[in-house]
Amino acid sequence: MFSYYFQGLALGAAMILPLGPQNAFVMNQGIRRQYHIMIALLCAISDLVLICAGIFGGSALLMQSPWLLALVTWGGVVFLLWYGFGAFKTAMSSNIELASAEVLKQGRWKIIATMLAVTWLNPHVYLDTFVVLGSLGGQLDVEPKRWFALGTISASFLWFFGLAILAAWLAPRLRTAKSQRIINLVVGCVMWFIALQLARDGIAHAQALFS
């Protein structure tokens, strides 16, 4: 059964490693050393719920609900544009230390709300967990399926905690004005690039829906 565990671990790692909204948010919280362990835990738990839903049959709801998929897609577009704008605004600030200090004033619940939006308003998360993992893990028997799911869940926990801890450890180097400008510019570009991709997918879905 360990072979199924390592298959899930490898596939989960391959899907989670690319820089996306979730990873960027966890990394930034780690650099700020602001609730970064809590955010890593909540991201991992969110992935656990999504992975279990995808592998154990919940994918049918999203795949059979084009209106729900469209709602998630366009909600993600709006959120990513807003999040990217905030990153660009911080990067272009004449006093980036002051701008970063303003961000640090955010309360715990606002940070949690942002994390939930980053995770649950990203349609790529549903495609990864429901379509990819659901199609592969859903074909397995009950016991192998559990080991496969455990492997993918392990990848999420290892990655998010590792990213948060590593970012916090490197914080003294990454919190310089130059590093913060570069990081925020990269994050802004990634967020807007993903938003444009989602908008393109959303237009295609709308055309198919009304054709």
UniProtKB/Swiss-Prot annotation:
Origin organism lineage: Bacteria, Pseudomonadati, Pseudomonadota, Gammaproteobacteria, Enterobacterales
Signal sequence region: none
GO molecular function terms attached to this record: L-arginine transmembrane transporter activity
Protein name in the entry: Arginine exporter protein ArgO
Annotated catalysed reactions: L-arginine(in) = L-arginine(out)
Signals that turn on the gene: Transcriptionally regulated by ArgP. Lysine has a negative effect on the expression of argO.
Family to which the UniProt record says this protein belongs: Belongs to the LysE/ArgO transporter (TC 2.A.75) family.
Annotated membrane topology: Multi-pass membrane protein
Stated role: Involved in the export of arginine. Important to control the intracellular level of arginine and the correct balance between arginine and lysine.
Keywords: Amino-acid transport, Cell inner membrane, Cell membrane, Membrane, Transmembrane, Transmembrane helix, Transport
Membrane-spanning residues: 1-21, 37-57, 68-88, 111-131, 147-167, 182-202
GO CC terms in record: plasma membrane
InterPro entries linked to this entry: Arg_export_ArgO_enterobac, LeuE-type, Lys/arg_exporter
Keyword Membrane found: yes
Localisation per UniProt entry: Cell inner membrane
PANTHER family: ARGININE EXPORTER PROTEIN ARGO (PTHR30086), ARGININE EXPORTER PROTEIN ARGO-RELATED (PTHR30086:SF20)
Pfam families: LysE (PF01810)
Organism: Escherichia coli O157:H7
